[in-house]
Amino acid sequence: MKAKVIVGMSGGVDSSVAAWLLKEQGYQVEGLFMKNWEQDDHNDYCPAAKDLADAQAVCNQLRIPLHTVNFSKEYWDRVFAYFLSEYEKGRTPNPDVLCNKEIKFNAFLNHALTLGADYIATGHYAKNTIEGSIGYLFKAKDREKDQTYFLHAVEPEALSKTIFPIGDFTKPQIREFAKQLGLVTHAKKDSTGICFIGEKRFKTFLNEFILAKPGEIKSTGGKTLGQHDGLMFYTLGQRQGLGIGGLQNSTDEPWYVVDKDIASNTLYVAQGSQHPMLYSQGLICGPIHWLADYENHLPLTCFAKTRYRQTDQACMISPPDNNQHYVMFSSPQRAITPGQFIVFYEKNQCLGGATIEQIIR
């Protein structure tokens, strides 16, 4: 009997096809649906209920059992509390990275092992290789959909217990498989945005948990231009929603957020999408979570992304200084955002990543 694999079934097309591919390869396949968020249950439309129904329908079609588990407490403690604390500091976190690290490749993995799994699998667009108890992470065939940026914080030991069945396929191929199989998820839209917010407006959602502190919007020259609703609602490079268009004798170019001064609660803006204040030559990041043995090879020249779907940018990582690293880029980078992640690559391999702490102009 081939190994037992438990697939994280989200109710989407990617995990549906992942389960089918594993079954075709002869694995003993079971599904598991994770509920990670309780807040939506009072709504008329609950996405979690629809996703569970779709996951169950797919498992019925594939004739595999579906387990369910509630990780809402773990999610709140390990992901959402961090998400809120970062926004309270005026930073812009990425909860998907932490959700993968703490929930999908930790809580889910441990739960699956108690159910007798040899491996877990997910519908992520990524690839890995396994050497003993260590897994190495590589980009998916579909570069447009590659999700290694969100997986860089997963432990190498967890990657050694993981299979990524769809990593060698493109999204159109996955949809075509699902359509040919008649899976109920074949035409389901990809989920977008932060999983626990769903269709809510982001501002409305944050207001439920954090007290907003309005303050001044100023030009880079120090001129007061208006009022902001709270620094947490704005991110570097943002253009929409500033409410200061068409001001006194200014050029017609739009305004962009270029800085946030937490101490004075001031939002700084400048005109023009190419304004120098939007660009940084480098950044300071926290400790690097390494997925490959490069820790003792610093300084290191490699490539990096400071946001999802950015093309790889040439950079140099310095040796650690006080548990931080300086990363300098070959060309200036636009709208690098503290609280987000920088993820490092060498060709197709994901080397690891770190939290962006400061920008270096």
From Swiss-Prot:
Residues engaged in binding ATP: 8-15, 34, 123
Site, Interaction with tRNA: residue positions: 124, 340
Record's keyword terms, sorted: ATP-binding, Cytoplasm, Disulfide bond, Nucleotide-binding, RNA-binding, Transferase, tRNA processing, tRNA-binding
Pfam families assigned: tRNA_Me_trans (PF03054), tRNA_Me_trans_C (PF20258), tRNA_Me_trans_M (PF20259)
Gene3D superfamilies xrefs: Adenine nucleotide alpha hydrolases-like domains, HUPs, Translation factors
Protein family: Belongs to the MnmA/TRMU family.
A GO CC term attached to the entry: cytoplasm
Reactions catalysed according to its record: S-sulfanyl-L-cysteinyl-[protein] + uridine(34) in tRNA + AH2 + ATP = 2-thiouridine(34) in tRNA + L-cysteinyl-[protein] + A + AMP + diphosphate + H(+)
Intrachain disulfide bonds: 99-195
Role noted for this protein: Catalyzes the 2-thiolation of uridine at the wobble position (U34) of tRNA, leading to the formation of s(2)U34.
Protein name stated in the entry: tRNA-specific 2-thiouridylase MnmA
Subcellular location per the Swiss-Prot or TrEMBL entry: Cytoplasm
Stretch list, region Interaction with target base in tRNA: 94-96
